[in-house]
Amino acid sequence: IFDRLVTKYNGNKSVKHFTCWNQLLCMLFGQLSSRESLRDLIIVIEAHQSKSYHLGFGKNVTRSNLSKANENRNFKIFEDFANHLILIAQEKNSNDSFEIKGTVYAFDSSTIDLCLSVFWWAHFRKTKAGIKLHTLFDINTQIPVFIHITEANVHDVNAMDVIKYEPFAYYIFDRAYVDYLRLYRITKSDAYFVVRAKSNVKFKRMYSKKTDKSTGVIYDQTGKIDGFYTSKDYPEKIRKVKFFDAENKKMLIFLTNNFDLSAQQI
């Protein structure tokens, strides 16, 4: 698979020694051994040169040729290979702990602070640089299947635009992702969402289901989003579930476009 991708993207064109495979192994070793920089990685490789050569790192690995390879080679070689490995890992790690048909994903972001003088391209604040990692996480297999990197000042909700929604899969979001136009895109993709509602959600109840309050479910309602613009952004019925988390003494409200799962499952 990797060789085919290298051929597809001309990764080894005019390369004599340091191939794409050598580059991949070097970078994997750097990640697995928690190297802090390319300089740190090269020092370790040079210290164990005979072993590193037999491990497939190639000969005469230098910071210069590794840096040039990272900068100039087509990233699609490694992205496509990573996606291939993720699919294999998902199949091997799959379990049905949720007892729900369909893949369950959680989507959230993390901000990583960086040194402005080094990472000038990731300008965040006056004296600070930073990036934001938007991660789609497969709950069943415990594997991140998609990571989108943006500047740190990009709002979380914008990252929803790059998700390729799978039919009949479930997507879990926190309150930062309440955007009815974007949530409606999930519905039109034949996928499901469960999102924590904001406290000021405008909701017009149509009817309610009976609930057992001893389970923590306060109510299970079906209705429509109220509001001149928001009702146009999400014109279809939506479900609202209120739940009391006894362990954390917290009241939670969820919105979903799934009407088949029990309120407890939501």
What are these regions (language model features)?
Residues 55-75, 83:
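Major-groove recognition helix of helix-turn-helix-like DNA-binding domains
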Residues 121-123:
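Short, P/G- and charge-enriched loop/turn segments at secondary-structure junctions
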Residues 96:
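Noncatalytic carbohydrate-binding groove/subsite architecture in carbohydrate-active enzymes
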Residues 48-56, 266:
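Extended, structured, electrostatic nucleic-acid-contact surfaces
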Residues 1-40, 44, 73, 80-84, ...:
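Single, function-defining residue in the core of a domain
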